[in-house]
């Protein structure tokens, strides 16, 4: 279907349509786009005009196509001449806006045919058909002549992009540029643009902004363009918006109802009038002053020049004072009357904004932006609203010495006094100004904004110095509550969610927000300025940006945090990469469009930067090259100079640059780590050969056997794992990883010796020469405060090495006895004398983190103890703790020695806080034994020492001044909640301790918020209560605390409703096990639905969080099998006024499916009565034989077998997918609603993608569909020729049956009786008897009719009729079975006199 414009003449295009479909290359490039948008916030309408300058790549250019989705094309002009020959083909509107009753695919099909519907939309397919694309096709008039012209001569006429200049064959000459103008209109957009006008009575909170969550599928919803990342051009954006908030939805044309006096009275605020009047008053004052001075000229001793200087200074001071007074008055007016606030346009390159009055409408203004650097349409963004704006203060400009305290104090004073002036003054310098925009709400005040974003200035300054110049002139950030993802990256603009902001009293988001802001700024260099040529090249851009984030983390937070993050990222990759495809081919066969919101790129963001890190380590270690510090600036320089074609980066080009810098081939590295999946798992054996004086190492790769062992579902849940399995059944695992590795051996002289070895096979045997010539003695313990570390004596004595030790706390006998600790020098469960015979202290494999791997080394436990205490490297300490954790978990060892080592590690404040957390987590892995004094008891003692009153479980008043201790305080209860005894239950000791912490928590004297801490405590207490929910006494205490904190948050709301939503979900969990009567569920749902966004008691983010939590509980509490609940859910999904809730609702559905599949809770939910009855009828219809009847009646007997099969199926992802499909295939209401929703035009592109992906997992898609056709007429028209007379021909047309059935007449044969025979007289001799001849009578054959048998049915009871069995016997008998809906009762036989019942007990069912 094609939709034509009003005056279109499609004949000229239809004949050539086949040519358009066969075009497989672009025959033009876009050089420049000028977009004019008139935005109406009140009606959600945008009137746009796009002026596009294209450069033909062929001379006979006949047609051009642009991506246009969900917009109405009003007019098209080519070279300022109207063009009626265009076609706007929008399948999305054509297929979804029509009547669904007339849709052949919709009528008689269901959700199993959803993939046919998906194939109709190009954005949802990897290789879409041409007729499924939403395109505007324009015919270039034949009157326009295209010829080659000089490119330099045309550079003044149109800004040709670098992609054109650097394209081979187009350097000296280009074809004649063509200018097209497209007029269009957008109403109520669903994707690409988001209107937020939910506050009907607060128009100053209305806003509209662009969204690019779906890559290369967002910009075409609001501007005609070629929506590809490599189609870059320069831009000019012109916005027509209301001048003030009160002008929204109004219009006042010039000359209407009076002249401009009306404008001054009604539309211009008072301060504008004052501004116009003040210069005149100043001039008059100057004249008076000059007259007085002329009169007294002879009396004054000053010269004329000095007087003039004094006057200028006084005038400048007075102007500044007047401006400050005007700003103050204006701020007061805006605070008193928000409708007087200015409407602000935030766009790229805000430093060159031009604000002009509207030419015809007095209530509007025009804002014009220019983007000189070529940018793809996907990265053009803007936001409009009555925003507050702040300029970030400058932290340390390059000209100021950071060590000079005096100058730094002066600079700080100047920055505080003149924040806005510094931005204007430094635009031309190396400082990149950053502007922040937020809505005028109480939650986003100046302190909150500056506290969260002040680090951005230092981040962007570090990037520009280390990796190359910032590609734009400025940067702005807009924080909005409805942004679908944490940050959306545009050219010189970032649109972020307000959840990244945090006030001064919240410290939990400090690290996460800083990391997200660092990513947003790094993406400006890589992902915006430099883009991938193909989707599978995205790993390069994300890897570069992530590597930049690593370096700025090292700069801002220190080397320990940097190394700890690297090690944790490596462990996370090992945990997740058992089911992931290679990052170099992730998007081959994957779901489209690629979305930031659905975390399609999350694993690449994790792994790609680590690959660049290990590549950098190998390059700098083996070849002594500069590594990534030379590669990245070289790529950025190529992008700025035009040497990188179209600023599009490919994997092959990135590999080529790395090889040029490294001066060697890296093909094996890229094949193993980029184009292969998985990570190595290394098992290392070591032995010292005293005869040869070498250390013999054996390194074996065992990832084929151990990677993903006993893992079914990844970190992101069942839905993501299932989708990855369906999209990438072949993971292309790397069998053997190769490359260099650094081995560090700490020998007895205290010196670490490094050895670089090469791994070339799955098993590598290495001999490392021993270096120490003389035997050293080692002084154990002590030395914690010795900074020199090594003592050298001139005497001829054995060298004694004094080693600085960590963990040397709680060493006195009293402390060891009180806390059940072993001696500090005892570090092994084996014989301590063995340590004296060892050739080295400890050995580290891959000491420089050149491999992303999991390592197992068979060195003794005392070596790991030395490594933990004496090696200052964070990675070494973490490896040692992982060893103890592995021994406790897999070895089942209850070692007090190991527990004491972990205790001292966790309690020693000199350790990095991440190491202390890891030690606490390792202690929680001990299986609880009342007779064992270590493990869990040590973990409780750590919390008591740090945070409780002496010898009690009552915590001290909270004090979060020390962030390191705060993270310990938050995480130790989480680790305690995981503790189990031998029976898999949580010990009473732990349960009571966690409850005491929650009961006696006190935050009155703390200046920081404890909302996140209380939320964590509630989650942990509920978790241990669910572990043994039959403990009614403990359960009552838990419910009492839930009620207490619920009342508290009702009086004093928590930050983003963290505590309230946690209590809601806790109640659902308790109700699920029968420990809580969830009677208020209905009231809670109704309260949340009727609360409305306009409620001023809570923030917007709090309302959104509460609403989504209620929606989640409703679905889990039976809503997935309740038609009314599903109808409510789909209405929210499609029609809720908050776009954030609409987008996140589909994520809630996916999360609920994850939960019910993993815990099997859907089986405990009863279906609707109507759907249950319908399913019974369907089963009865399928009964065809006696075997089917017996199978139907004995269906409940197969439950045991079903449980066994399900248990086997849960051991792999394929079995889980089948279990999921079995759960949902029989419930028709959900299938019908999902099918109806997919056929509605109200969904956004993200929602449509997510539902299609979810359906692909939940149901088996069938490659056939039902089509209903009209019944053909019984008669058809036929023509017969009759020629009765010569020369005359009659043609008779009449209707004749289509099928002629010739039925033969019945032949009834009647047999006549033969005639009577003539009597023959025979005379015989003698008196003998005469024999008579019998008559031959032939009777006709008569078919006997079937005899009717009367029968009746005796029915027992009122249950639904399930089975009727009729037996044909001499005496007809009818047997009935009336089976109730129970798996324990079965009526096997019923007659008129008796019936048989079979009853099973629960014990029988289990057996």
UniProtKB/Swiss-Prot annotation:
Residues 252-336 are annotated as: Disordered. The modification Phosphothreonine is found at residues 158, 161. Residues 304-337 form a coiled coil. It is found in: Nucleus. GO terms for cellular component: nucleus; transcription factor TFIID complex. One of its GO terms (molecular function) is chromatin binding. Keywords: Coiled coil, Nucleus, Phosphoprotein, Transcription, Transcription regulation. It comes from the Eukaryota. Residues 308-326 have a biased composition (Acidic residues). CDD domains: M1_like_TAF2. Residues 1285-1350 are annotated as: Highly charged. SUPFAM superfamilies: Leukotriene A4 hydrolase N-terminal domain (SSF63737), Metalloproteases ('zincins'), catalytic domain (SSF55486). GO terms for biological process: positive regulation of transcription by RNA polymerase II; transcription by RNA polymerase II; transcription initiation at RNA polymerase II promoter. Present with 1200 molecules/cell in log phase SD medium. Functions as a component of the DNA-binding general transcription factor complex TFIID. Binding of TFIID to a promoter (with or without TATA element) is the initial step in pre-initiation complex (PIC) formation. TFIID plays a key role in the regulation of gene expression by RNA polymerase II through different activities such as transcription activator interaction, core promoter recognition and selectivity, TFIIA and TFIIB interaction, chromatin modification (histone acetylation by TAF1), facilitation of DNA opening and initiation of transcription. The 1.2 MDa TFIID complex is composed of TATA binding protein (TBP) and the 14 TBP-associated factors. One copy of each TAF1, TAF2, TAF3, TAF7, TAF8, TAF11, TAF13, two copies of each TAF4, TAF5, TAF6, TAF9, TAF10, TAF12, and three copies of TAF14. Belongs to the TAF2 family. This is Transcription initiation factor TFIID subunit 2. The gene is TAF2.
């Amino acid at each position: 279907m094609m939709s034509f414009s009003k005056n279109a003449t499609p004949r000229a295009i239809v004949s050539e349509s086949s040519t358009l479909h066969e075009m497989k290359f672009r025959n033009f490039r876009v050089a420049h786009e000028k977009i004019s948008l008139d935005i109406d916030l009140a009606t959600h309408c945008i009137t746009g005009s796009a002026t596009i300058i294209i450069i033909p790549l062929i001379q006979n250019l006949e047609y051009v196509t642009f991506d246009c989705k969900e917009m109405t094309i009003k007019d098209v002009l080519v070279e300022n001449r109207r063009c009626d020959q265009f076609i706007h083909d929008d399948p999305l509107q054509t297929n979804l806006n029509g009547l669904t009753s007339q849709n052949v695919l919709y009528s008689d099909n269901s959700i199993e045919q959803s993939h046919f519907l998906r194939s109709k939309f190009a954005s949802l397919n990897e290789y879409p058909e041409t007729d499924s694309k939403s395109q505007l096709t324009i015919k270039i008039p034949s009157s326009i002549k295209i010829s080659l012209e000089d490119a330099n001569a045309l550079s003044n006429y149109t800004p040709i992009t670098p992609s054109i200049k650097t394209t081979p064959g187009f350097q000296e000459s280009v074809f004649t540029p063509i200018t097209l103008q497209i007029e269009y209109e957008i109403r109520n957009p669903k994707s690409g643009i988001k209107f937020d006008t939910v506050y009907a009575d607060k128009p100053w909170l209305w806003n509209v902004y662009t969204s690019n969550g779906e890559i290369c599928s967002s910009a075409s919803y609001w501007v005609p363009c070629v929506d590809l990342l490599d189609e870059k051009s320069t831009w000019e954006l012109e916005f027509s918006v209301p001048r003030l908030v009160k002008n929204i939805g109004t219009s006042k044309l010039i000359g209407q109802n009076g002249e401009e006096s009306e404008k001054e009275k009604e539309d211009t605020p008072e301060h504008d009038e004052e501004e116009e009047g003040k210069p005149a008053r100043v001039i008059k004052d100057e004249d008076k002053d000059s007259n007085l001075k002329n009169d007294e000229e002879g009396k004054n001793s000053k010269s004329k020049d000095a007087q003039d200087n004094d006057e200028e200074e006084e005038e400048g001071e007075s102007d500044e004072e007047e401006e400050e007074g005007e700003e103050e008055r204006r701020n007061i007016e805006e605070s008193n009357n928000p409708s007087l606030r200015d409407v602000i346009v935030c766009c790229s390159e805000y430093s060159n904004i031009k604000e002009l009055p509207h030419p015809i409408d007095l209530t509007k203004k025009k804002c014009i932006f220019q983007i000189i650097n070529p940018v793809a349409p996907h990265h053009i963004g803007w936001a409009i609203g009555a925003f507050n704006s702040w300029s970030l203060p400058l932290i340390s400009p390059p000209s100021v010495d950071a060590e000079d305290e005096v100058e730094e104090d002066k600079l700080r004073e100047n920055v505080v006094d003149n924040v806005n002036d510094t931005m204007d003054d430094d635009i031309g310098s190396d400082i990149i100004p950053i502007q922040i925009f937020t809505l005028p709400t109480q939650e986003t005040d100046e302190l909150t904004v500056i506290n969260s974003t002040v680090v951005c200035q230092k981040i962007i300054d570090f990037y520009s110095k280390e990796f190359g110049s910032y590609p734009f002139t400025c940067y702005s950030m807009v924080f909005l509550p409805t942004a679908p993802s944490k940050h959306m990256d545009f050219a010189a603009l970032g649109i972020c969610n307000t959840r990244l902001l945090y006030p001064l009293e919240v410290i939990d988001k400090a690290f996460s927000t800083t990391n997200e802001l660092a990513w947003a700024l790094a993406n400006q260099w890589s992902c915006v300025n430099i883009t991938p040529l193909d989707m599978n090249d995205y790993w390069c851009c994300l890897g570069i940006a992530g590597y930049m984030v690593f370096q700025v983390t090292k700069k801002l937070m220190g080397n320990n945090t940097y190394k700890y993050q690297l090690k944790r990222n490596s462990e996370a990759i090992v945990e997740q990469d058992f089911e992931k495809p290679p990052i170099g081919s992730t998007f081959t066969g994957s779901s489209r469009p690629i979305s930031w919101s659905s975390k399609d790129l999350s694993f690449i963001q994790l792994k790609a930067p680590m690959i660049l890190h290990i590549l950098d380590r190998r390059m700098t270690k083996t070849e002594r090259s500069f590594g990534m510090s030379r590669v990245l600036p070289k790529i950025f320089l190529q992008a700025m100079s035009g040497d990188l074609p179209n600023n599009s980066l490919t994997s092959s080009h990135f590999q080529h640059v790395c090889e040029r810098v490294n001066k060697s081939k890296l093909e094996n590295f890229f094949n193993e780590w980029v184009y292969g999946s998985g990570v190595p798992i290394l098992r290392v054996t070591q032995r010292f050969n005293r005869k040869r004086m070498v250390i013999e190492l054996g390194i074996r790769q065992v990832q084929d056997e151990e990677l993903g062992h006993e893992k079914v579902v990844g970190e992101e849940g069942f839905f993501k794992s299932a989708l990855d399995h369906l999209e990438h059944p072949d993971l292309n695992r790397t069998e053997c990883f190769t490359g260099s590795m650094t081995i560090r051996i700490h020998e007895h002289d205290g010196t670490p010796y490094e050895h670089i070895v090469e791994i070339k096979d799955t098993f590598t045997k290495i001999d490392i020469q021993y270096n120490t010539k003389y035997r050293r003695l080692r002084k154990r313990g002590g030395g914690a405060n010795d900074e020199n570390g090594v003592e050298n004596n001139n005497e001829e004595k054995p060298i004694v090495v004094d080693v600085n030790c960590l963990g040397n706390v709680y060493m006195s006998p009293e402390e060891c006895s009180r806390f059940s600790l072993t001696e500090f020098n005892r570090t092994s469960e084996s014989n301590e004398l063995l340590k004296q015979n060892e050739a080295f202290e400890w050995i580290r494999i891959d000491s420089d983190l050149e491999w992303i791997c999991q390592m197992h080394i068979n060195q003794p436990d005392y070596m790991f103890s030395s490594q933990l205490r004496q090696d200052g490297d964070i990675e070494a300490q973490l490896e040692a703790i992982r060893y103890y954790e592995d021994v406790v978990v897999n070895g089942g060892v209850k070692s007090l020695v190991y527990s004491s080592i972990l205790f001292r590690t966790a309690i020693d404040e000199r350790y990095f806080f991440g190491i202390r957390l890891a030690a606490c987590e390792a202690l929680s892995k001990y299986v609880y034994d009342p007779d064992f004094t270590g493990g869990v008891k040590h973990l409780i003692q750590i919390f008591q020492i740090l945070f409780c009153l002496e010898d009690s479980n009552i915590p001290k008043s909270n004090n979060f001044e020390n962030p390191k201790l705060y993270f310990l305080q938050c995480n130790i209860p989480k680790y305690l909640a995981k503790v189990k005894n031998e029976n898999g239950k949580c010990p009473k000791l732990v349960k009571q301790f966690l409850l005491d912490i929650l009961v006696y928590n006190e935050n009155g004297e703390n200046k920081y918020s404890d909302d996140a801490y209380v939320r964590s405590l509630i989650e942990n207490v509920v978790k241990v209560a669910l572990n043994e929910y039959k403990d009614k006494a403990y359960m009552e205490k838990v419910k009492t605390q839930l009620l207490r904190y619920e009342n508290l948050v009702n009086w004093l709301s928590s930050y983003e409703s963290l505590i309230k939503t946690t209590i809601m979900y806790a109640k659902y969990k308790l109700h699920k096990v029968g420990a809580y009567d969830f009677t208020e569920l209905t009231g809670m749902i109704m309260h949340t639905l009727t609360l409305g966004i306009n409620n001023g008691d809570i923030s917007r983010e709090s309302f959104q969080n509460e609403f989504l939590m209620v929606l989640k509980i409703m679905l889990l509490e039976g809503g997935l099998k309740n038609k009314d609940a599903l109808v409510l859910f789909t209405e929210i999904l499609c029609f809720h006024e908050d776009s954030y809730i609409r987008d996140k609702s589909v994520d809630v559905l996916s999360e609920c499916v994850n939960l019910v599949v993993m815990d099997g809770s859907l089986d405990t939910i009863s279906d609707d009565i109507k759907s249950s009855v319908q399913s019974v009828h369907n089963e009865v219809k399928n009964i065809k034989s006696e075997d089917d009847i017996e199978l139907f009646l004995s269906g409940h007997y197969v439950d045991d077998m079903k449980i066994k099969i399900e248990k086997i199926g849960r051991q792999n992802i394929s079995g889980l997918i089948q279990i999921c499909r079995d759960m949902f295939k029989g419930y028709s209401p959900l299938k019908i609603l999902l099918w109806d929703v997919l056929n509605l035009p109200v969904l956004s592109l993200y929602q449509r993608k997510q539902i299609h992906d979810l359906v692909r997992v939940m149901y088996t898609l069938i490659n056939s569909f039902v089509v209903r056709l009209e019944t053909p007429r019984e008669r058809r028209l036929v023509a017969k020729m009759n020629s009765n007379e010569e020369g005359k021909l009659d043609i008779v047309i009449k209707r004749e049956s289509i099928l002629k059935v010739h039925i033969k007449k019945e032949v009834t044969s009647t047999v006549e009786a033969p005639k009577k025979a003539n009597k023959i007289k025979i005379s015989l001799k003698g008196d003998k008897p005469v024999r008579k001849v019998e008559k031959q009578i032939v009777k006709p054959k008569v078919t006997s009719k079937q005899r009717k048998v009367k029968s009746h049915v005796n029915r027992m009871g009122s249950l639904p009729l399930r089975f009727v069995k009729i037996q044909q016997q001499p005496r007809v008998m009818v047997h009935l079975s009336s089976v109730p809906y129970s798996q324990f009762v079965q009526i096997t036989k019923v007659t008129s006199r008796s019936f048989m019942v079979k009853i099973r007990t629960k014990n029988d069912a289990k057996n």
